[in-house]
């Protein structure tokens, strides 16, 4: 199955009819093949929450801006969103902030998953400290084979229904887009130029890590977007390519 699985008690109705058959948004899952980590190691990581439940990740861009995936915010109103920052645990700790507004990329397509990126403005400025920091966005793609890390909260298996409290992370390698769409893997032409792939055998982001950070060289290089299964050797994880959206992020962060 695809790694996108909606937390049924929270978002199933909101997302019905907007995602292609077999391609459900990855809104509440876990890192596959990874390890427990702390927010001090990933101080840019946030938890997007609705009705008190974690459903997506995100990355701190500035004192009042968070970057996430567009598919996380379909059929959702800003007043229903909360952002927890500064905690290793999505359920407690740190601080929780209301959302003033958000904007999905104008070219986002829920069928092809192109332009799967969004900007959130929170109500109050964040106070930066060791557990709450912005991350710089990439202005060029990392090289093929570069080490990257993805972090998030989620279930213990693809399609699972419970999520751990503790933040998890996994180390991956960047795969060039042309290689990701080659016969070596199973995606073919589904991989577009707005996307970035990362891979390690039996390691991956999974349901619930959506919108979260893929970081390489201390830069945000990707936003967790989609993929078939979790940790399937035939299918790398697919991310929104942050370098491709660099100008859009800067502009939208001023406008939203």
Swiss-Prot record:
InterPro entries: Peptidase_S1, Peptidase_S1_PA, Peptidase_S1_PA_chymotrypsin, Peptidase_S1A, Trypsin_dom, TRYPSIN_HIS, TRYPSIN_SER. Its EC number is 3.4.21.4. SMART domains: Tryp_SPc. The record marks 204 as: Required for specificity. The active site is at residues 71, 116, 210. The lineage of its organism: Eukaryota, Metazoa, Ecdysozoa, Arthropoda, Hexapoda. The keyword Protease applies. PROSITE patterns: TRYPSIN_DOM, TRYPSIN_HIS, TRYPSIN_SER. It is found in: Secreted, Extracellular space. Belongs to the peptidase S1 family. GO terms for molecular function: serine hydrolase activity; serine-type endopeptidase activity. It catalyses: Preferential cleavage: Arg-|-Xaa, Lys-|-Xaa. GO terms for biological process: proteolysis. One of its GO terms (cellular component) is extracellular region. Disulfide bonds join 56-72, 180-197, 206-230. This is Trypsin epsilon.
């Amino acid at each position: 199955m695809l790694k996108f699985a909606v937390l049924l008690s929270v978002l199933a109705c909101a997302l019905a009819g907007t995602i292609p058959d077999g391609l459900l948004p990855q809104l509440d899952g876990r890192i596959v093949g990874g390890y427990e980590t702390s927010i001090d190691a990933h101080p840019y990581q946030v938890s997007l929450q609705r009705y008190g439940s974690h459903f997506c990740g995100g990355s701190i861009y500035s004192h009042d801006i968070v970057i996430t995936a567009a598919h996380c915010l379909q059929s959702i109103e800003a007043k229903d969103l909360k952002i927890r920052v500064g905690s290793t645990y999505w359920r407690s700790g740190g601080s929780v902030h209301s959302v003033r507004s958000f904007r999905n990329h104008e070219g986002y397509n829920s069928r092809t998953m192109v332009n799967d990126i969004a900007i959130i403005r929170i109500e109050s400025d964040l106070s930066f400290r060791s557990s709450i920091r912005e991350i710089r966005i990439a202005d060029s793609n990392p090289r093929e084979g570069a080490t990257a890390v993805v972090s998030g909260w989620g279930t213990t298996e693809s399609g699972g229904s419970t999520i751990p409290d503790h933040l998890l992370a996994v180390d991956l390698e960047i795969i060039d887009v042309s290689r990701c769409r080659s016969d070596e893997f199973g995606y073919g032409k589904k991989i577009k130029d707005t996307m970035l792939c990362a891979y390690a055998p039996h390691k991956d982001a999974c349901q619930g890590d959506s919108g979260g950070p893929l970081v390489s060289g201390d830069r945000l290089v990707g936003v967790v977007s989609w993929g078939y299964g979790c940790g399937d050797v035939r299918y790398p994880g697919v991310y929104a390519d942050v370098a491709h959206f660099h100008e859009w992020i800067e502009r939208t962060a001023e406008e939203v």
